[in-house]
From Swiss-Prot:
Encoding gene (name): rps2
Superkingdom classification of source: Archaea
Lineage: Archaea, Methanobacteriati, Methanobacteriota, Methanomada group, Methanococci
InterPro entries, per database record: Ribosomal_uS2, Ribosomal_uS2_arc, Ribosomal_uS2_CS, Ribosomal_uS2_euk/arc, Ribosomal_uS2_flav_dom_sf
Protein name listed in UniProt: Small ribosomal subunit protein uS2
Gene Ontology CC annotations of this record: small ribosomal subunit
GO molecular function: structural constituent of ribosome
GO biological process, alphabetically ordered: translation
Pfam families: Ribosomal_S2 (PF00318)
Similarity comment text for this entry: Belongs to the universal ribosomal protein uS2 family.
Xref: Gene3D superfamilies: Glucose-6-phosphate isomerase like protein, domain 1
Length: 220
């Protein structure tokens, strides 16, 4: 496999471990699996991950940043997600997703995004449940063991590793900004910038700071 037409170099993809899955697989994710290693780990197809990343960023670029909600409960994803929100202006929820955020107009931080972006459909199940209830599209980073019946657009990736999630958020941020004409070929931020946030394991998830920004109401 060559680097031609990839969003980053193949070496960068492999070094980040985005292709390293788990020892479980589902029928939903079979089409994204390249092979199984001798130790039983399923390996994702890097080229398919790259393709889906590109398409996800293109889809998201149809939305204003305030109309997108990006969510994660995974500790190592919190820092990269916050950096993602910082560089794109996209609203983020890092840590516990308060029930009713999308469904209860009386909730203190009630929001009406037009699209939801999840780091892990299983861990972020409350956000997914509410997105299904209100009928907005869901993009999800999915590993080999995930069920994807309620995910409208799958990004197959290792969504647990620090390097892999940092690279995912960096590339989607970069492509989102490029597609919207906000940056040129050279992004004013880097993968290392996102990775540095992931390496900070002392991330504080203060309930008062978990959700940032304000949301426009969904267009009727």
């Amino acid at each position: 496999m060559s680097d031609e037409n990839l969003l980053t170099t193949l070496d960068t993809y492999l070094a980040s471990g985005i292709h390293i899955g788990t020892q479980q697989k589902t029928e939903d994710m079979r089409r994204f699996i390249y092979r199984v290693r001798a130790d039983g780990l399923y390996v994702l197809d890097v080229r398919k991950t790259d393709e889906r990343l590109r398409l996800a960023a293109k889809f998201l670029s149809n939305y204003e940043p305030e109309d997108i909600m990006a969510v994660t409960r995974r500790v190592y994803s919190v820092g990269p997600l916050k950096e993602f929100g910082k560089v794109t202006g996209i609203n983020t929820v890092a840590g516990r997703f308060v029930p009713g955020t999308l469904t209860n107009p009386s909730a203190r931080k009630f929001a009406e995004p037009e699209v939801l972006f999840l780091s892990d459909p299983r861990v972020d199940k409350q956000a997914l449940k509410e997105a299904i209830e209100i009928g907005i599209p869901v993009i999800g980073m999915c590993d080999t063991e995930h069920l994807t019946a309620h995910i409208d657009f799958i990004i197959p990736t290792n969504n647990k590793g620090r390097k892999s999630v940092s690279l995912m958020y960096y590339l989607i941020a970069r492509e989102y900004m490029k597609n919207r004409g906000l940056i040129g070929e050279e992004a004013p931020f880097s993968y290392d910038q996102f990775l540095e946030k992931a390496m900070n394991v002392k991330v504080k998830m203060n309930p008062s700071n978990r959700q940032r920004g304000r949301f426009h109401r969904r267009r009727r």
